[in-house]
């Protein structure tokens, strides 16, 4: 039986030193394996006490000093919920740490036995004990650094024992990351900002989630996305959790570690102290005893499949369990030569690998394998046996044999044997690639998708991007890539190809939109995110010609795109070529327009590029089929790239706009977005999503071939938000109004008028139906915009166009009679004192709304019409006086605004020498004088009612000369 005798250096606690002079331990079975080494169950020969002995491998004195410093701290810890430290045994390059044996294994094992996880009441006992242990540790200045269910052990009576703090973290911190501890790590640790005792509180919260759901937060994300989620996202617990528990978790998951509660504070939390079905006083009845119960160590704690870096030294093999069994059966162990001879034989394969590694040197094992693989023909049974040896080496021997095999030049011999090569793919891909596994005949022999994708992904890091893309074009099976899209490596490869390989648009995209793949795409938000992001890249990088011709343009300002055949810019007369037109006309956007999405290689398409891109057949149908599915996805990253893809699609092919206009699922999707975004903290991404949606809706309103109540209703919802989407909503309303005026015919004549209450405009779409446009909502939007808002110029331009339309005199009157009208106008001029164009736009707007209001309320010679002297018209006369009083007030302000002699005037005021500004001010001033509105040929022309048939004909024939700005057809005294 193996033992650790007193010939080795044994360091004991004071109690042990007082009771015995030497200690000998019998090593029983292996109960754990991990990044740190091996854990054995052992028995003290003198006392029969069962202990756990952890083997820690170190490589140099520096690592040994780190371990010894931690041990010096551990030996002073003494708490019921901390695994007791008994001492250590030091050998050449191993350190054996003697710890308390926990018969019931880890809490992870207990959780795994449940189909759904522990209940809240069950978990409270374990959480409370864990907090007691953390309170003690933190009071001693110790940070655990790796709290999770696998590191919370249970004694024979189910008392919680915190284990694996300090030692394994110091010895191999990178191994912890590889083991998957990212899901439990606090943001300050992931961000390399340093750990504190409060970092353990975050990990405790993740462990509570693990107890109740069997998985930690963000368990379905890749490593890169876990980093992002922990740092930036808010974790929302399942709805089944009680409110006290949700509050408990919210306190654990505070991103600022200095605002997190301590373990002592959490012990006082209402969730911990609620006593329903829980008797907390039972904790005090737990007693420790060391029974020789059957071990219950679970696979999670053993971490049998860790990807760790092995030691550079060829260390002594682990103590052999076979010796104990052989002594009992009175057998002698085989010799090294016997084992190596058996290893070469294909007729009698070696099955006891533990014996092989205990007796034979690593060099001799590696040399024997190389000798066999060098034969002309190699038996398949030998290949299988060698594969098992490498697997055992990885799991139980720190990969020392694999390192020796590489050093002795064995890799070229396994290239043609996938069963052997796969054992090196994950840990040593570069070595395989350097030995020629990516050479086409060798690569073609590989059949396992996981290893193929891993090698292709690693090949990217070792070659140039251009070469890698060309290689993938020739040798990568696209169907294999897409059928394994659930694999992390497949997702990474797809993103890289879509970003850098121009051929991905023609070779990958048609296969990606196959309806058979849709279910796989929707398996998880991560996959959906990758697919939509990749297609965005493919569209914007599919051809070198597009790269050269693409000019960055704003995806949020459709008015800056080339006018379509139905654009109001080409359909409504304007009295003059105005600065409004200059601001609204087509112009190239700044190259920094897409700074917020600078991680995109290219994400804009110029008008020239639109002609070069032809989307695959069925692409639009495939894309729109996701509108219903998006209702189940709350991930903003997915929605961001989905909406961007929708915008790019209709921007490339405007014929899809009318198809989208008839798609009820599209408008339902917008309503669903409206319910999700208010509860998301990522304002930047939310703004980007709305930017794409409103851009699509604006383009739809420009190209629509029929009036859409759904689009109109959506636009009104945008307006009611009173934010950046409101301007787009107003623009859509304007385009809808222009559409009704453009498409008047003799059978159905859509008109714009007002109801008797003057509270709404009725936009008639046919003889039986009309859409209501509330005046008060338009007025509220005008006054809701801040004076310094960057959208002011656009707002004034759109309001000018709407107010100039026939039938909207009531809107102009309501704007003027608003209590804040004068203050708003003064504030506008004060804010934009240095902008000549905006001041001109404001003056034109003022002139328009006063002239239309006066024409509505007054007769057209400046005198009340005696024929209309009814009681309502007498009230109109009082309204006229009120309106003129406001006009006089505005005129006085304008007189002083550019007057250099006024003391309070801004010294940097521009426009005082502008002929156009002077003329506009004079026009506005003249409106306050009687007789200023000359008699015109028709009342309908002056007021701005719907045009006659002849007028409509003239309107359409002159649309190519129009800039979209119209006022009532009248003249003013100047």
Curated annotation (Swiss-Prot):
<dbReference type="Pfam" id="PF00069">
    <property type="entry name" value="Pkinase"/>
</dbReference>
<dbReference type="GO" id="GO:0106310">
    <property type="term" value="F:protein serine kinase activity"/>
</dbReference>
<dbReference type="InterPro" id="IPR000719">
    <property type="entry name" value="Prot_kinase_dom"/>
</dbReference>
<dbReference type="InterPro" id="IPR011009">
    <property type="entry name" value="Kinase-like_dom_sf"/>
</dbReference>
<dbReference type="GO" id="GO:0004674">
    <property type="term" value="F:protein serine/threonine kinase activity"/>
</dbReference>
<feature type="modified residue" description="Phosphoserine">
    <location>
        <position position="567"/>
    </location>
</feature>
<feature type="compositionally biased region" description="Low complexity">
    <location>
        <begin position="554"/>
        <end position="563"/>
    </location>
</feature>
<keyword id="KW-0418">Kinase</keyword>
<keyword id="KW-0132">Cell division</keyword>
<comment type="similarity">
    <text>Belongs to the protein kinase superfamily. Ser/Thr protein kinase family.</text>
</comment>
<dbReference type="GO" id="GO:0005524">
    <property type="term" value="F:ATP binding"/>
</dbReference>
<dbReference type="GO" id="GO:0007096">
    <property type="term" value="P:regulation of exit from mitosis"/>
</dbReference>
<dbReference type="InterPro" id="IPR017441">
    <property type="entry name" value="Protein_kinase_ATP_BS"/>
</dbReference>
<dbReference type="GO" id="GO:0005816">
    <property type="term" value="C:spindle pole body"/>
</dbReference>
<feature type="binding site">
    <location>
        <position position="54"/>
    </location>
    <ligand>
        <name>ATP</name>
    </ligand>
</feature>
<feature type="domain" description="Protein kinase">
    <location>
        <begin position="25"/>
        <end position="272"/>
    </location>
</feature>
<dbReference type="GO" id="GO:0005737">
    <property type="term" value="C:cytoplasm"/>
</dbReference>
<feature type="active site" description="Proton acceptor">
    <location>
        <position position="146"/>
    </location>
</feature>
<keyword id="KW-0963">Cytoplasm</keyword>
<comment type="function">
    <text>Protein kinase of the mitotic exit network (MEN) essential for late nuclear division in the mitotic cycle. Promotes mitotic exit by phosphorylating DBF2 and directly switching on DBF2 kinase activity. Involved in the localization of DBF2 and DBF20 to the neck which is necessary to undergo cytokinesis. Plays a role in segregation of chromosomes during recovery from spindle checkpoint activation. Required for spindle pole localization of CDK1 and inactivation of CDC2 kinase activity at the end of mitosis. Required for spindle disassembly after meiosis II and plays a role in spore morphogenesis.</text>
</comment>
<feature type="region of interest" description="Auto-inhibitory domain">
    <location>
        <begin position="751"/>
        <end position="974"/>
    </location>
</feature>
<keyword id="KW-0547">Nucleotide-binding</keyword>
<keyword id="KW-0498">Mitosis</keyword>
<keyword id="KW-0597">Phosphoprotein</keyword>
<dbReference type="InterPro" id="IPR008271">
    <property type="entry name" value="Ser/Thr_kinase_AS"/>
</dbReference>
<keyword id="KW-0206">Cytoskeleton</keyword>
<feature type="binding site">
    <location>
        <begin position="31"/>
        <end position="39"/>
    </location>
    <ligand>
        <name>ATP</name>
    </ligand>
</feature>
<feature type="region of interest" description="Self association domain">
    <location>
        <begin position="360"/>
        <end position="702"/>
    </location>
</feature>
<keyword id="KW-0723">Serine/threonine-protein kinase</keyword>
<feature type="modified residue" description="Phosphoserine">
    <location>
        <position position="561"/>
    </location>
</feature>
<dbReference type="GO" id="GO:0000281">
    <property type="term" value="P:mitotic cytokinesis"/>
</dbReference>
<protein>
    <recommendedName>
        <fullName>Cell division control protein 15</fullName>
        <ecNumber>2.7.11.1</ecNumber>
    </recommendedName>
</protein>
<keyword id="KW-0131">Cell cycle</keyword>
<dbReference type="InterPro" id="IPR050629">
    <property type="entry name" value="STE20/SPS1-PAK"/>
</dbReference>
<dbReference type="GO" id="GO:0051229">
    <property type="term" value="P:meiotic spindle disassembly"/>
</dbReference>
<feature type="modified residue" description="Phosphothreonine">
    <location>
        <position position="870"/>
    </location>
</feature>
<dbReference type="GO" id="GO:0000922">
    <property type="term" value="C:spindle pole"/>
</dbReference>
<dbReference type="GO" id="GO:0005935">
    <property type="term" value="C:cellular bud neck"/>
</dbReference>
<dbReference type="GO" id="GO:1903024">
    <property type="term" value="P:positive regulation of ascospore-type prospore membrane formation"/>
</dbReference>
<keyword id="KW-0067">ATP-binding</keyword>
<feature type="compositionally biased region" description="Basic and acidic residues">
    <location>
        <begin position="948"/>
        <end position="963"/>
    </location>
</feature>
<feature type="compositionally biased region" description="Polar residues">
    <location>
        <begin position="564"/>
        <end position="579"/>
    </location>
</feature>
């Amino acid at each position: 039986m193996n033992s650790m005798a007193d010939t080795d250096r044994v360091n004991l606690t004071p109690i042990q030193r007082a009771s015995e002079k030497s200690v000998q331990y019998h090593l029983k079975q292996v109960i754990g394996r991990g990044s740190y080494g091996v854990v054995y169950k052992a028995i003290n020969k003198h006392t029969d006490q069962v202990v756990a002995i952890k083997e820690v491998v170190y490589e140099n004195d520096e690592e040994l000093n780190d371990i010894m410093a931690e041990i010096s701290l551990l030996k002073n810890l003494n708490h019921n919920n901390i695994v007791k430290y008994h001492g250590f045994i030091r050998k050449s390059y191993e350190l054996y740490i003697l710890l308390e044996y926990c018969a019931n294994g880890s809490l992870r094992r207990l959780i795994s036995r449940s189909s759904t996880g522990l209940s809240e009441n069950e978990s409270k006992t374990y959480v409370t004990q864990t907090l007691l242990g953390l309170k003690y540790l933190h009071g001693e200045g110790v940070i655990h650094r790796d709290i999770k269910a696998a590191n919370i052990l249970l004694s024979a009576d189910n008392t919680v024992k915190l284990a694996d703090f300090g030692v394994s973290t110091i010895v191999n911190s990178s191994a912890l990351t590889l083991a998957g501890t990212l899901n439990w790590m606090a943001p300050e640790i992931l961000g390399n900002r340093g750990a504190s005792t409060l970092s353990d509180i975050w990990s405790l919260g993740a462990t509570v989630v693990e107890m109740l759901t069997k998985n930690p937060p963000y368990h379905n994300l890749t490593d890169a996305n876990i980093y992002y989620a922990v740092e930036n996202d808010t974790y929302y617990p399942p709805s089944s959790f009680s409110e006290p528990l949700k509050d408990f978790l919210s306190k654990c998951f505070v991103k600022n570690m200095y605002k997190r509660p301590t373990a002592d504070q959490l012990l006082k939390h209402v969730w911990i102290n609620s006593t329903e079905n829980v008797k907390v006083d039972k904790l005090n009845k737990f007693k420790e005893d060391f029974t020789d119960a059957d071990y219950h160590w679970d696979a999670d704690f053993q971490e049998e499949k860790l990807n760790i870096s092995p030691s550079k030294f060829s260390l002594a093999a682990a103590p052999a369990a076979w010796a104990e069994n052989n002594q009992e059966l009175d057998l002698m162990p085989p010799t090294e030569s016997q084992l190596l001879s058996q290893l070469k034989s294909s007729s009698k394969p070696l099955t006891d690998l533990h014996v092989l590694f205990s007796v034979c040197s690593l060099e001799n094992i590696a040399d024997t394998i190389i000798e066999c693989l060098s034969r002309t023909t190699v038996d398949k049974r030998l290949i299988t046996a060698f594969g098992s040896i490498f697997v055992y080496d990885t799991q139980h021997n720190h990969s020392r044999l694999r390192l020796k095999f590489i050093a002795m030049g064995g890799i070229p011999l396994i290239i043609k044997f996938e069963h052997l090569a796969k054992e090196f793919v994950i840990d040593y891909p570069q070595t395989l690639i350097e030995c020629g596994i990516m050479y086409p005949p060798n690569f073609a022999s590989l059949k396992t998708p996981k290893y193929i994708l891993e090698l292709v992904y690693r090949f990217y890091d070792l070659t140039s991007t251009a070469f890698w893309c060309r290689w993938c074009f020739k040798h990568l099976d696209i169907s294999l890539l897409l059928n394994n899209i659930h694999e992390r490596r497949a997702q990474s490869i797809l993103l890289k190809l879509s970003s850098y390989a121009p051929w991905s648009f023609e070779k990958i995209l048609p296969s990606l939109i196959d309806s058979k793949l849709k279910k796989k795409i929707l398996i998880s938000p991560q996959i959906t995110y990758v697919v939509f992001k990749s297609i965005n890249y493919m569209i914007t990088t599919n051809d070198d010609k597009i790269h050269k011709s693409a000019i960055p343009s704003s995806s949020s300002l459709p008015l800056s795109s080339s006018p379509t055949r139905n654009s109001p810019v080409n359909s409504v007369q304007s009295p003059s070529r105005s600065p409004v037109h200059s601001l609204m006309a087509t112009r190239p956007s700044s190259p920094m327009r897409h700074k917020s999405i600078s991680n995109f290689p290219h994400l804009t398409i110029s008008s020239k590029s639109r002609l070069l891109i032809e989307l695959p057949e069925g692409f639009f149908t495939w894309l729109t089929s996701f509108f219903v599915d998006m209702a189940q996805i709350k991930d903003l990253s997915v929605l961001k790239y989905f909406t961007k893809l929708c915008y790019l699609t209709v921007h490339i092919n405007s014929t899809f706009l009318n198809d989208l206009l008839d798609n009820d699922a599209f408008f339902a999707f917008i309503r669903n977005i409206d319910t999700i975004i208010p509860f998301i903290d990522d304002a930047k991404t939310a703004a980007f999503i709305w930017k794409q949606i409103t851009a699509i809706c604006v383009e739809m309103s420009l190209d629509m071939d029929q009036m859409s109540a759904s689009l109109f209703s959506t636009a009104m919802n945008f307006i009611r938000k009173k934010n950046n989407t409101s301007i787009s909503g107003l623009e859509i309303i304007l385009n809808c109004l222009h559409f009704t005026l453009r498409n008047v015919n003799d059978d159905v004549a859509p008109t714009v008028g007002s109801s008797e209450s003057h509270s709404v405009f009725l936009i008639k779409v046919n003889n039986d139906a009309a859409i209501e446009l509330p005046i008060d909502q338009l007025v509220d939007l005008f006054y809701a915009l801040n004076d310094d808002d960057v959208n002011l110029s656009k707002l004034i331009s759109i309001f000018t166009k709407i107010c100039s339309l026939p039938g909207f005199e009531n809107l102009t009157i309501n704007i003027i009679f608003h209590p804040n009208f004068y203050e708003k106008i003064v504030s506008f001029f004060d804010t934009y004192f240095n902008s000549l164009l905006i001041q001109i736009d404001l003056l034109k707007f003022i002139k328009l709304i006063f002239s239309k209001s006066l024409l509505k309320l007054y007769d057209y010679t400046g005198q009340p019409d005696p024929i209309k002297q009814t009681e309502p018209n007498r009230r109109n006369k009082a309204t006229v006086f009120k309106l003129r009083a406001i006009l006089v007030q505005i005129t006085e302000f304008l007189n002083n605004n550019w007057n250099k002699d006024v003391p309070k005037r801004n010294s940097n005021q521009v426009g005082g020498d502008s002929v156009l500004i002077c003329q506009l001010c004079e026009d506005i001033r003249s409106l306050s004088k009687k007789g200023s509105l000359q008699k015109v040929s028709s009342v309908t022309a002056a007021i701005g009612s719907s045009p006659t048939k002849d007028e409509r004909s003239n309107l359409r024939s002159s649309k190519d000369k129009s800039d979209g700005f119209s006022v009532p057809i009248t003249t003013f005294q100047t």
